[in-house]
């Protein structure tokens, strides 16, 4: 038996889906506006390699590799990427596109990841983190928030600082400690949240991995690893254009995100 769906039903469904996309776009832009309203312009500060001498040797190597003397500090970032993503470690990869905004002096970001069926909004704005996932831009299926989410979002912001490396320079939030010739400890502290990363570097100074312990559930942390590669120069700054994100569990390493940067802009308001 052939089932014929009335044209009015099809048109109604299309209009509902279109409305969902319009509402999603509007809400995303509204949150970006809040992020920018809380962004302070620090581009008047400039990188000076002569101030690196007290840092661990591989960290000095990194900054000399990715920054040039006189480089303006980065205040804000707008980034677009494509890639592959897993909604569950037991499932296969699906295609994803992403758009993301960062502020630097105040830790903030918002990311919108879009797949064929789902849209995810991951954010940390005005000291509040959240992860929300929508089916067809309309039906909320995930609504994560709380202290574990707040910490995880700040860890994401810190790891993704490789895309705006002046944020990795020593500050009241960021400290570096020596480990060995090719690794260092990055300690981060902001208000009541503190954590550290084990950061590894290659021979030419590029950061290749950042590893920390991150909440995988509300109650349990697991090893979380970001791998960076394919460094290219943008506006005099060398950044990785390829990133892979992995959970290291008792069952082994589980890759769940592979992103390729398509566009990045600095200090645009």
Task: Identify the function of each model-found stretch.
Residues 74-80, 104-111, 179-187, 208-209, ...:
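Short, hydrophobic/aromatic-rich segments at coil-to-beta transitions
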Residues 1-40:
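N-terminal membrane-anchoring alpha-helices
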Residues 184-266:
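Gly/Pro-enriched, hydrophobic low-complexity segments
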Residues 60-140:
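N-terminal mature ectodomain segment of secretory-pathway/periplasmic proteins
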Residues 59, 63, 97-100, 128-133, ...:
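Buried hydrophobic residues that stabilize the cores of well-folded domains
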Residues 133-192:
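Flexible, processing/modification-adjacent segments and terminal tails
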Residues 99-103, 122-124, 173-179, 199, ...:
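Short, exposed beta-strand/loop patches in secreted or surface proteins that constitute
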Residues 28-78:
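N-terminal leader/targeting segments and the immediate start of mature chains
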């Amino acid at each position: 038996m052939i089932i014929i769906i009335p044209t009015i039903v099809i048109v109604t469904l299309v209009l509902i889906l279109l409305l969902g996309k319009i509402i999603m776009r509007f809400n995303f832009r509204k949150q970006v506006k809040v992020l920018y309203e809380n962004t302070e312009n620090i581009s008047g500060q400039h990188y000076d390699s002569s101030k690196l001498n007290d840092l661990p040797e591989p960290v000095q190597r990194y900054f000399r590799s990715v920054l040039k003397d006189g480089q303006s500090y980065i205040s804000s970032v707008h980034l677009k990427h494509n890639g592959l993503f897993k909604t569950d470690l037991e499932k296969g990869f699906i295609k994803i596109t992403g758009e993301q905004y960062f502020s630097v002096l105040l830790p903030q970001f918002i990311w919108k990841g879009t797949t064929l069926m789902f849209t995810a909004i991951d954010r940390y704005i005005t000291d509040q983190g959240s992860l929300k996932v929508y089916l067809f831009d309309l039906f909320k299926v995930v609504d994560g928030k709380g202290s574990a989410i707040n910490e995880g979002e700040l860890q994401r912001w810190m790891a993704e600082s490789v895309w705006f490396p002046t944020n990795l320079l020593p500050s009241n939030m960021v400290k570096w400690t020596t480990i060995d010739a090719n690794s260092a400890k990055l300690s981060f502290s902001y208000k009541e949240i503190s954590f550290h990363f084990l950061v590894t570097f290659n021979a030419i100074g590029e950061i290749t991995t950042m590893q920390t312990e991150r909440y995988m559930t509300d109650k349990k942390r697991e090893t979380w690893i970001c791998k960076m590669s394919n460094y290219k120069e943008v506006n005099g700054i060398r950044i990785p254009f390829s990133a892979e994100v992995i959970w290291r569990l008792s069952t082994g390493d589980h890759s769940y995100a592979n992103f390729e940067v398509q566009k990045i802009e600095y200090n645009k308001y």
